[in-house]
């Protein structure tokens, strides 16, 4: 059986640009792309924390260290500059692989500078 697990997440990034007439995609600061282990042109899910919108697109590289998170093309209608978003990607793997797999979690500040990384999410308690 193949399972779909969270591969990578950039948590609560701030949308810095929104380009309706660009060719689509989400441009992500190259430093964040690498830290998350995301590839250019990889399918990503975007979850807008500010307005609840959810959509998929593909990632492209923005300038390394720029802090750019730019939602482009038709997807630009789902965000505004300043919105908080979560960028996530999933990977398919066997049960044996899933038993030892840990995702790349990247956390950023309001300027999209990486603050820290992790490979697990704390257990939620009441």
From Swiss-Prot:
Taxonomic lineage: Bacteria, Pseudomonadati, Pseudomonadota, Gammaproteobacteria, Lysobacterales
Sequence positions that bind substrate: 57, 73-75
Family: Belongs to the PanD family.
GO biological process, one term: pantothenate biosynthetic process
PANTHER family per record: ASPARTATE 1-DECARBOXYLASE (PTHR21012:SF0)
Keyword annotations of the record: Autocatalytic cleavage, Cytoplasm, Decarboxylase, Lyase, Pantothenate biosynthesis, Pyruvate, Schiff base, Zymogen
Residues with the Pyruvic acid (Ser) modification: 25
Source organism (scientific name): Xylella fastidiosa (strain M12)
InterPro entries reported for this sequence: Asp_de-COase-like_dom_sf, Asp_decarbox
Gene for this chain: panD
Protein name according to UniProt: Aspartate 1-decarboxylase
Reactions catalysed according to its record: L-aspartate + H(+) = beta-alanine + CO2
E.C. number: 4.1.1.11
